[in-house]
Amino acid sequence: PILQGESTTGIFSIDFYDKNNGYAIGGDYTKPEIDSLNKIITRDGGKTWKTIANNNNLGYRSCVQYFPNSNGKKLLAVGFNGVDYSSDSGLNWKHLSDDGYYTVRFLNDTTAYAAGNGKISQFIFK
């Protein structure tokens, strides 16, 4: 169900909150504005996947991570074209920054580190 067919398309990141709930993100990094068929979700441990949040202005992203201890509700996604946050399991996204990153990891429930474009940044969430 994901955008594919070119060497620049596909899934670029996957994260699981627990053994059942997972989210994958990607797209086409040469056409980062395409915001459909680039996000998929599973609720059964990866047996089935469905597209989610199509046409919601969240185009290509290179990394997605669940917030620890968020019951699988909160996600952070980064890419060379920005940072975005979801509080509803990835259905809707809020754009936080135009700063570009390639990867992100959480230190704890409220602190994440993102890296890319020659920089490392800390994000603090309340």
Where on the chain are the PLM-derived regions?
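Residue-level hotspots at or immediately adjacent to binding/recognition sites across diverse folds
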Residues: P1-K126
